[in-house]
């Protein structure tokens, strides 16, 4: 034990240091700290970091106090902390209108300010005069508000302040998709005011959300009304994005020392210890110097070469700051604190000694931490040539309050005055600890007793919804509406949480609302918004994905409880049995494992003691919040209609329902629809009102009327049997079929009025007697085109029965009959949108995957590079899809599937930066045409009629890069649907050898071999000779000639002979797939960066990628990769794009040679053209015809597209010869001669 005198003396010394270097800047009225005596503004982030030393010293005094003076000193210091935190709270509460607006817009103009007036708590600069949007600063405030409250400080006083803090939670919970200016306030490192997604902001928001969740802001004096609620799905979004970004800091910064604050104290936001170590090592190796760490590479702040009269940099100017970036001592304080938390005494000692050596001695010998160390102006060139050799000079603020505070705090920790747990009472430091395996509790509930009896026949005993009363079961969308009430405050005009989708983490908790227990079904089972939940196989697939997600992402005390409802839509078509996919899934759940997840199947009553509970007391009767505060509360837009209610019949008795029950029933009833259309006839084939020929001719005759109306004129028309005679291809694949088949004349006519126009009233009368789904669709489509969606049909004399209502009912019937083409088309007419569309899009963008919708080129192909509001995103998709509304709906579907895969299998997207949805759809249709041996028109029809499960499966095989085949399957006899059934299977050695299954893998292997061979430029040119001479030699076992037009065959290493006919089209298809999904070899962008330093640029399809980009961007920046992609994506043909990538990879081999320059602008197109000509010459020389077919758009031989990368006739051979020939022309003095 240290003696009182020694510890007291040391603490008094720190108290003097705190007073003279930090508290002397504190305003006595507001409690805010000014940045310095010259700069009177108070930065939010700096204020919080600067007060940490005061907070820590107060706790140290309280722990070591055995005199009243020490206790008084501790109280004084703690109140200084409270005063500052409340001062920041007052600054933010004065901008409450911005908090309310930002929740909906996420606009930089609506953000809280980053700095305030120290004396008045007012703003100091305009909304657009500073990079105010800094999510990490607001998150840091919430994080330490939680930590300090948990330590015993009372900072929040009233329920109005509690409501404001709850809305700050909503403010930061979207951090995973908000591009901000980051902790250095500059955004993109060009300092041009461009916001970007920053890992430091995402990580700090994640930590704040986790820390403040379920925290009582009144501390020991509070109740349930002062508890803050956070939805776990928002936290997990941040976690997922953070994992995908690190160690990269942002789009323009490949590494940033600010990441220390999220991988260690104070955030501890990263749960993967390996990722923590990788990020830390990246910072040390790339940013650390003799005086601290530079903030990021090519940081020009306060360097001698920075122009202080200019706010922004020129892009090419960033190269000037290389190797002379200023070094900041503050980052060494992070390493000291990190060493204390991790128990690394060596790290603590090393960095304490290093920091002591660069501190500045002030008056009376006090130690001051300077802001930064800069290179002297007269030694810039010397430092640039020999980094870390020049002695630097201190610049900026002395002391730097942020660094000074962390220096004092680190000293208190290192010397034992504070324990790690005292400044981390919420135990954030254990984030990397091993978590126990999660067991997901699954309860299966039958919608009614009929379904319950059907399950019992199969030996599955479950409860019905009525059996678990008084526990209430509600769909997940009800929980979204309930949470929309959270945080409302009329005094401050706060509306609460915006209505948003709640994920499976949120619906896997049990909720206590007004002393009633509620369980909510996951939203993927909700059929009210989009048609994915109408496919039972898709529901089962989503259940598998969500169970695995729960096992991986559940962090709460207790087990997750997933309620899986079995509704009447999960029965067979005749309703006599349970759908086989659903039944087999229940069997797997009974085994205890499903999709790799540990599960426990049981009744809900068995899980009540082991589940996690959330108490939503903001809906208690004594709260000010009213459920029905306006007439339109809880209503749905027309796109949410359906006749599948499902949950209404088993709720509490009407007489005993309170306001909450009435509110829930109001929400449920708003999505229900009455039935107006006549029931369908089971034998639909014999009950058509119109013949196919008559309907075809007459529907075409009214199309002209659609042009004058404000409705889409859709050349694709309805995907029904009636209209299939004239349906055209979706412009996805080439079709040899004529656009419109000629139909014979007939005397039949649509019912006409006296003016010769279609009599819509008589059409409605015919609709009453129409019992065929296809005919009902035809009639409603004609009414939609002529009269519009809002026209009142007065069907059966009932007022208010609009065309849109009837289409909604038809949508439900089509879902029951699994008519997927019709479902997608009606979804387009009703402008239905996936509820999670914006979220899915954001997931992809946050994983650094840009999106395009529509077919190339621009401007028809729309680029999505930043998150968009749902309405704006839907509008953009429909615009990009042109007049084809089914493609617009399918685009939404594909985006959702891609988001599922990027979360569950991110490895599928390695080296993909831009996902081009239009090309992906095109490739899917092409694959169907190839595999099913049908025309483009038939393939397009088949694609639109695929079930969601089959569509997702087809997409997965395309993304996986594996060879696969598609076959037609026999549909069960009892099925009434006309949609085609296909089966997708991987292709083994039939048609492709194992070593050649993935073209890009073979290309990578070839690159490695050639890299070893091309150690010098002379060696490189000699390969051109060798390749030329070997073209006529006998083929080895690794030779591949799928392109051979002479009919010769090759054999694999196993001796199995594969005919050219069997393998024809294999590599063309492989290149088309890789080009469509923009897949490139690993390390491709870094190699392009290197080759650009040896030439003036690369010309691709008429567009130049200049070498000047390397002066702005570093090789590992996402920003550079996106720039390269933007040039490559100018090429509309995916297979040609992939050949260009292969040619560039050959070129980049020169970056490893001793050649200092390879000329001016290199035209990659010419190299590919030369390679194709060399290929043609060799083919002719071995007996092929000299009129081999060429691609009209590019002039490349079709057989060259279809050549494997390797082998004597492989594309690599010819591209290598072409590069050698091309560079020989550019470099005539190289001393190499081609023969």
UniProtKB/Swiss-Prot annotation:
Subunit structure: Hexadecamer of 4 heterotetramers, each composed of alpha, beta, gamma, and delta subunits. Alpha (PHKA1 or PHKA2) and beta (PHKB) are regulatory subunits, gamma (PHKG1 or PHKG2) is the catalytic subunit, and delta is calmodulin.
Post-translational modification: Although the final Cys may be farnesylated, the terminal tripeptide is probably not removed, and the C-terminus is not methylated.
Phenotype for residue 299 to G: In GSD9A; type 2
Pathway: Glycan biosynthesis; glycogen metabolism
Tissue: Predominantly expressed in liver and other non-muscle tissues.
Impact when changing residue 132 to P: In GSD9A; type 2
Pfam family, one: KPBB_C
Impact upon substituting residue 132 to Y: In GSD9A; type 2
Result for mutant: residue 1207 to W: In GSD9A; type 1
Molecular functions (GO terms): calmodulin binding; phosphorylase kinase activity
Residues with Phosphoserine modification: 695, 729, 735, 983, 1015, 1044
Residues bearing a lipid moiety (S-farnesyl cysteine): 1232
Family statement drawn from the similarity comment of this UniProt entry: Belongs to the phosphorylase b kinase regulatory chain family.
Membrane topology type: Lipid-anchor
Family matches, as SUPFAM superfamilies: Six-hairpin glycosidases
Top-rank taxon: Eukaryota
Regulation: By phosphorylation of various serine residues and by calcium.
Protein name, per record: Phosphorylase b kinase regulatory subunit alpha, liver isoform
Region (Calmodulin-binding), start-end ranges: 807-837, 1059-1099
């Amino acid at each position: 034990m240290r003696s009182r005198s020694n510890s007291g003396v040391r603490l008094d010394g720190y108290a003097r240091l705190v007073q003279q270097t930090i508290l002397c800047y504190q305003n006595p009225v507001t409690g805010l700290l000014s940045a310095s005596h010259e700069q009177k503004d108070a930065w939010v982030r700096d204020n919080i970091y600067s007060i940490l030393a005061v907070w820590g010293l107060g706790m140290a005094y309280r722990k070591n106090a055995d005199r009243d003076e020490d206790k008084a000193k501790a109280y004084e210091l703690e109140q200084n902390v409270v005063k500052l935190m409340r001062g920041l709270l007052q600054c933010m509460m004065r901008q409450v209108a911005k908090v309310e607006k930002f929740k909906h817009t996420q606009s930089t103009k609506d953000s809280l300010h980053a700095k305030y007036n120290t004396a008045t708590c007012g703003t100091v600069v305009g909304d657009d005069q500073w990079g105010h949007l800094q999510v990490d600063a607001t998150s840091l405030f919430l994080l330490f508000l939680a930590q300090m409250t948990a330590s015993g400080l009372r900072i929040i006083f009233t329920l109005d302040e509690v409501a404001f803090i709850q809305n700050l939670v909503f403010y930061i919970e979207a951090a995973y998709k908000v591009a901000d200016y980051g902790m250095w306030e500059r955004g993109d490192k060009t300092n041009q005011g461009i916001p970007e997604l920053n890992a430091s902001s995402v990580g700090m928001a994640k930590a704040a959300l986790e820390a403040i969740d379920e925290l009582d802001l009144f501390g020991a004096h509070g109740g349930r009304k002062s508890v803050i609620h956070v939805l776990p799905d928002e936290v997990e979004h941040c976690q997922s994005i953070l994992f995908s970004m690190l160690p990269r800091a942002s789009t323009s910064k490949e590494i940033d020392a600010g990441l220390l604050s999220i991988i260690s104290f104070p955030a501890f936001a990263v749960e993967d210890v390996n990722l923590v170590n990788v990020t830390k090592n990246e910072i040390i190796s790339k940013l650390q110097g003799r005086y601290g760490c530079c903030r990021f590479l090519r940081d020009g702040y306060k360097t001698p070469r920075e122009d202080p009269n200019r706010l922004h940099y020129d892009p090419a100017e960033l190269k000037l700051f290389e190797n002379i970036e200023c070094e900041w001592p503050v980052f060494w304080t992070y390493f000291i604190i990190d060493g204390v938390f991790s128990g690394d005494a060596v790290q603590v000692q090393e960095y304490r000694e290093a920091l002591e050596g660069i501190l500045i001695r002030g008056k009376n010998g006090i130690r001051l931490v300077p802001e930064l160390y800069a290179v002297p102006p007269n030694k810039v060139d010397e430092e640039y040539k020999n980094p870390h050799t020049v002695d630097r000079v201190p610049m900026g603020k002395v002391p730097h309050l942020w660094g000074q505070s962390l220096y004092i705090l680190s000293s208190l920790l290192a010397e034992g005055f504070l324990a790690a747990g005292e400044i981390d009472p919420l135990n954030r430091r254990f984030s990397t600890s091993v978590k126990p395996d999660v067991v997901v509790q699954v309860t299966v509930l039958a919608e009614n007793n009929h379904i319950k009896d059907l399950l019992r026949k199969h030996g599955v005993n479950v409860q019905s919804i009525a059996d678990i009363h008084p526990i209430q079961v509600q769909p997940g969308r009800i929980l979204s509406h309930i949470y929309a009430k959270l945080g409302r405050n009329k005094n401050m005009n706060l509306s609460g949480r915006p209505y948003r989708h709640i994920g499976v983490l949120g619906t896997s908790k049990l909720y206590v609302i007004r002393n009633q227990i509620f369980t909510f079904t996951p939203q993927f089972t909700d059929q009210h918004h989009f048609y994915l939940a109408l496919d039972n196989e898709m529901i089962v697939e989503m259940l598998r994905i969500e169970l695995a997600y729960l096992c991986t992402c559940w962090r709460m005390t207790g087990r997750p409880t997933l309620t899986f409802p079995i509704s009447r839509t999960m029965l067979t078509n005749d309703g006599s049995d349970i759908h086989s996919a659903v039944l087999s899934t229940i069997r797997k759940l009974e085994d205890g494992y499903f999709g790799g997840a540990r599960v426990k199947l049981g009744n809900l009553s068995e899980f009540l003691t082991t589940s996690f509970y959330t108490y939503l007391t903001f809906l208690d009767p004594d709260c000010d919040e009213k459920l029905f505060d306006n007439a339109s509360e809880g209503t749905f837009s027309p796109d949410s209609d359906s006749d599948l209610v499902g949950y209404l019949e088993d709720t509490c008795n009407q007489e005993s329902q309170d306001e909450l029950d009435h509110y829930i029933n109001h929400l449920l009833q708003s999505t229900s629809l009455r039935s107006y259309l006549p029931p369908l006839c089971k034998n639909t084939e014999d009950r058509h009102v119109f013949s196919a020929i008559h309907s075809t001719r007459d529907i075409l005759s009214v199309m002209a009327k659609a042009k004058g109306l404000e409705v889409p004129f859709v050349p694709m028309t309805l995907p029904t049997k009636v209209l299939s005679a004239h349906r055209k291809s979706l412009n996805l694949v080439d079709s040899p079929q004529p656009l419109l088949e000629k139909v014979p004349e007939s005397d039949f006519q649509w019912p006409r009025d006296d003016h010769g126009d279609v009599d819509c009233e008589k059409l409605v009368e015919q609709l009453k007697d129409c019992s065929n789904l296809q005919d009902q669709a035809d009639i409603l489509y004609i009414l939609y085109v002529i009269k519009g969606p809002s026209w009142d049909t007065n069907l059966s004399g009932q007022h208010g029965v609009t065309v849109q209502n009837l289409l909604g009912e038809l949508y439900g019937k089509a879902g029951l009959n699994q008519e997927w083409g019709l479902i997608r088309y009606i979804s387009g007419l009703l402008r239905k949108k996936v509820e999670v569309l914006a979220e899915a899009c954001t997931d992809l963008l946050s994983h650094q995957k840009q999106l395009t919708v529509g077919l190339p080129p621009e401007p028809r192909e729309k680029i999505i590079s930043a998150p968009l509001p749902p309405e704006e995103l839907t509008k953009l998709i429909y615009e990009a899809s042109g007049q084809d509304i089914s493609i617009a709906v399918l685009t939404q579907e594909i985006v959702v599937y891609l988001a599922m895969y990027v979360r569950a299998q991110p490895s599928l997207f390695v080296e993909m930066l831009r996902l081009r949805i239009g090309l992906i759809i095109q490739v899917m249709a092409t694959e169907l045409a190839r595999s099913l041996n049908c025309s483009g028109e038939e393939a397009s029809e088949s694609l639109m009629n695929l079930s969601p499960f089959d569509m997702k499966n087809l997409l997965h095989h395309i993304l996986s890069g594996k060879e696969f085949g598609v076959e037609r399957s026999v549909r069960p006899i009892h099925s009434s649907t006309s949609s085609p059934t296909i089966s997708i299977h991987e292709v083994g050695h039939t048609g492709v050898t194992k070593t050649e299954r993935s073209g890009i893998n073979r290309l990578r292997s070839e690159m490695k071999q050639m890299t070893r061979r091309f150690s010098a430029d002379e060696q490189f040119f000699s390969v051109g000779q060798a390749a030329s001479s070997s073209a006529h030699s006998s083929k080895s076992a690794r030779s591949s000639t799928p392109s051979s037009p002479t009919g010769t065959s090759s054999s694999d290493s196993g001796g199995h002979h594969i005919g050219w006919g069997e393998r024809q089209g294999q590599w063309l298809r492989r290149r088309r797939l890789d080009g469509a999904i923009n897949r490139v070899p690993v390390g491709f962008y870094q190699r392009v960066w290197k080759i650009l330093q040896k030439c003036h640029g690369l010309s691709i399809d008429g567009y130049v990628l200049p070498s000047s980009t390397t002066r702005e961007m570093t090789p590992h920046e996402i920003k550079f990769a996106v720039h390269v992609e933007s040039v490559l994506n100018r090429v509309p043909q995916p297979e040609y794009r992939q050949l260009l990538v292969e040619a560039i990879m050959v070129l980049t081999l020169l970056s490893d040679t001793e050649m200092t320059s390879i000329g001016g602008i290199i035209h990659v197109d010419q190299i590919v053209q030369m390679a194709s000509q060399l290929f043609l010459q060799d083919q002719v020389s071995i007996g092929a015809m000299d009129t081999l077919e060429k691609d009209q758009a590019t002039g490349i031989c079709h057989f060259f597209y279809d050549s494997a990368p390797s082998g004597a006739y492989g594309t690599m051979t010819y591209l290598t010869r072409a590069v050698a020939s091309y560079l020989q022309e550019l470099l005539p003095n190289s001393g190499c001669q081609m023969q």
